[in-house]
From Swiss-Prot:
The gene is fbp. GO terms for cellular component: cytosol. Substrate binds at residues 115-118, 211, 277. Mg(2+) 2 binds at residues 112, 115, 283. Pathway: Carbohydrate biosynthesis; gluconeogenesis. This is Fructose-1,6-bisphosphatase class 1. It comes from Pseudomonas putida (strain ATCC 47054 / DSM 6125 / CFBP 8728 / NCIMB 11950 / KT2440). It catalyses: beta-D-fructose 1,6-bisphosphate + H2O = beta-D-fructose 6-phosphate + phosphate.
Length: 336
């Protein structure tokens, strides 16, 4: 049986599920950009791409060279194709306007160009996270200037989401709203090839991912839940659990997606005015869409992530996602 490339898969989706051709082309362009980013990541010190730029992004985070390189690759790959009305990125303060010399399309692309980049200098897996939204009609005119409001849509409005993980293999995980597929980059062929047909989050779990160094700052429901996990067989859950923490959302969530468990980056008491660390638009929403399409669940402790109406482009949110039963347990603790 011949192997199914990403291009073939998307063409078949157009035929069988009426996936719009413009969306298909957009996903292919994003995938090509991810291949280029993968190349730069794999070169590391040989390509002179390690280290920081000496600048900060809108989040107040030090920008790595690869943050900027990856952001530029995604912008340059996608701006000219005629599929997008605009883009937004973790690395840019404001929405990116499609240059007037190019046609505007019907979609918006939101991305974290290099998630986990603080790990790049120590050769830990990093990735690219992206989300696709429809552009509101009032911004579709070639002469209409795009602003932040166009992007402020709840996660339920996503038409596609995915991430590329740059590890021992480069993989692309993708959902178009009808399940989750996994593609592995065949470097000899130069294409992403379908290798994981129907990814599902395992229902039972013995693993969780959280940064335990922040424990003293957590809210009581998270303290309670993690305490029960750590109590193991002698605790109320009557089961031993292992903790894994990579500090790269793509890597941690990829493990949860394939092996089950719970990923938690909850709000804490250090900055009470901030509802969390992770960004809603280009981290929590696409990852939550993927996890839900794979049979899992995602919450901020009180509400479903995908139901949250964004108030700003770089809004932060508490994130708890993974195996459905565990998410429901943590949510119940928050509501008691």
């Amino acid at each position: 049986m011949s192997r199914v490339t990403l291009s073939r898969y998307l063409i078949e989706q157009t035929r069988s599920n009426n996936t719009p051709a413009d969306l298909r082309f957009l996903i292919e362009v994003v995938a090509r950009a991810c291949k280029e980013i993968s190349h730069h990541v794999s070169k590391g010190a040989l390509g002179g791409v390690l280290g920081s730029m000496g600048t900060e992004n809108v989040q107040g985070e030090v920008q790595k060279k690869l943050d900027v390189i990856s952001n530029d690759i995604l912008l340059e790959a996608n701006e000219w194709g005629g599929h997008l009305a605009g883009m937004a990125s973790e690395e840019m303060d404001n929405a990116y306007q499609i240059p007037g010399r190019y046609p505007k399309g019907a979609y918006l692309l939101v991305f974290d160009p290099l998630d986990g980049s603080s790990n790049i200098d120590v050769n830990v897996s990093v990735g690219t996270i992206f989300s696709v939204l429809r552009c509101p009609n009032q911004y579709l005119s070639q002469n209409e200037s795009l602003n932040e409001e166009a992007f402020l849509q709840p996660g339920t409005e996503q038409v596609a989401a995915g991430y590329a993980i740059y590890g021992p293999q480069t993989m692309l995980i993708l959902t178009l709203g009808n399940g989750v597929k996994g593609f592995t980059l065949d470097r000899e062929l130069g294409s992403f090839v379908l290798t994981h047909e129907n990814i599902r989050v395992p229902e039972t779990t013995a693993e969780f991912a959280i940064n335990m160094s922040n424990q003293r700052h957590w809210e009581a429901p998270v303290q309670r839940y993690v305490g029960e996990l750590l109590a193991g067989e002698t605790g109320p859950l009557k089961k031993n659990y292992n903790m894994r923490w990579i500090a790269s959302m793509v890597a941690d969530v990829h493990r949860i997606l394939t092996r089950g468990g719970l990923f938690m980056y909850p709000r804490d008491a250090r900055e009470p005015s901030k509802p969390g660390k992770l960004r809603l638009m280009y981290e929590a929403n696409p990852m939550s869409f993927i996890i839900e399409q794979a049979g899992g669940a995602s919450t901020n402790g009180y509400d479903r992530i995908l139901d949250i109406k964004p108030e700003s482009l770089h809004q932060r949110v508490s994130v708890i996602l993974g195996s459905k039963e565990e998410v429901e347990r943590v949510t119940a603790y928050h509501k008691e």
